[in-house]
Structure formats: structure tokens, C-alpha cells
């Protein structure tokens, strides 16, 4: 499960490491029986698909480039994902694990007991046929029984034990998960903050932040941790994914990049940003990040 290395029979396959899609599967009803189908036979839930405007790295208003080296790529439909996990105390059965062209992680389709269907990010260890549940802040505060601490269940940070691995974490209550949603990512609950109503969480970057205890989080690590091993192998596959060629700064004009211009080929300078001349290897700390106290 995860990735496979292609035989080096051509230049495009020499270094290619691609997904094997072994985790893709779905329960399909055929007559009176439920049959498990695999890989390319798994089709998405049509009621949860929608057309998505593809900006291709450009502004909607002026059309100028806002994200370089993007554009083209295969046509794709957006899968509507439930990042809020706001359906409280209704059990849901995992019916499928599917590919999502808009993200590195896999997604899984849930069939709730009341008939509703939703997609969520696929956590590592969750299998087709398993049952998951979430609980809202209001129900948890009212003393209703909490779901089990296992992959796929969701609850407010206040009720998640210290040391638990989590993903799909909200920054603001009710806004939906924004942290740790990519393949293989995770965060960890460290404990209560000295500031009332906040929980200390170690981010995927290693930074420790205070997040409000009412914010929802999902138990477990995002699946497909092998994503970091993927090598597309050739430029054409990168174009299928919507990536355009990266132009070197030394090949540009002086108006376009600090490394541009000069007579003939030039050696370049120390790495600089095309916009403000800052060094590329420095990381600016977030000015608006929440200060924390570990004392």
C-alpha cells in the first residue's frame, strides 16, 4: 500500500515513484449483496461533486499572475469535503476510500444512519466497514457520552486526552478544519494552556500554538504518509497535475528578477525573492501568531 517504483525502461520512468492505489476501495450493492470493488472501478458520489472555477494561478479580477508556474492540467470535479464534522452523535459507516484530485490525501465516503452522505479526509488505519462518530461542543458540555478515541472520530479539543495524535483541526470554532489536512500530516495535543479556555497543540511544523478548546479536531493521522516519496518522473506528468515550467531568475530580464540581465550567461547571485529582494532561505515568523506560555 502506498507507492511503487517503476522499472527504468524509459527516461520518463527511470526515477518515477507513483501511487499504487491499493487503498482505493468501495462497497457496492449488486443485487442483495455488498461487493468490495478496488482501484479504477471506484466512482465518486455524484451528489457530492461540483464544478470548480480553476483560477490557473491568476487573479479573477485583473487576470494577472498571482501564483507562478500554475495552469493547464487535467479536468477535474471538486469533491465537497466535510471539514466541520458538525453532525453530532450520528454514527456513520465508511463505505469507500477514494482518490481526490484536489488534494494529496485520500478521502472516504460516510453513510450516516439518517441517510446523509459526506466525504471526510481519510485517517490512517480507518477501513471500509468501520463506524465513526463526532460530537459537538454543546452535546459534550451537556454530559452526553463521548465517542471513542480512535481514528476518524471527531470532538472538541477540550475532550481529547494529552498526547493524542490529531488532524483536521479548526483555528476558530465552527470554521472547519484548517490544520493538518495533507497526506501524512498530524498534530499532537500537549495539554491545557495557562490561558483559560485554550489547549496547547504541536503543529506539523513543530511550532506549539494555543487553540481554543471549542475547536473541533479529528483523531488520528492523515493517511498516505508515503506521499513524500512520490516522484512524478517526467515533466509531462507535472503538466497533467497543473504545474508549468519553473523559469530561472538568471534567464529573465532585470525588470522581472534580481538575477536577471547581464551580457551572455551569468553565474547568478545569492538566492533572492523576485518581489522584494529578501533572501530565499530565511523564514519570517508569523506576525499574527498567538503568543504562548509554557510556564
UniProtKB/Swiss-Prot annotation:
Keywords from the UniProt entry: Ribonucleoprotein, Ribosomal protein, RNA-binding, rRNA-binding
Biased composition (Basic and acidic residues): 256-287
GO molecular function: rRNA binding; structural constituent of ribosome; transferase activity
Function of the molecule: One of the primary rRNA binding proteins. Required for association of the 30S and 50S subunits to form the 70S ribosome, for tRNA binding and peptide bond formation. It has been suggested to have peptidyltransferase activity; this is somewhat controversial. Makes several contacts with the 16S rRNA in the 70S ribosome.
PANTHER family linked to this entry: LARGE RIBOSOMAL SUBUNIT PROTEIN UL2M, RIBOSOMAL PROTEIN L2
Subunit relationships: Part of the 50S ribosomal subunit. Forms a bridge to the 30S subunit in the 70S ribosome.
Name recorded for this polypeptide: Large ribosomal subunit protein uL2
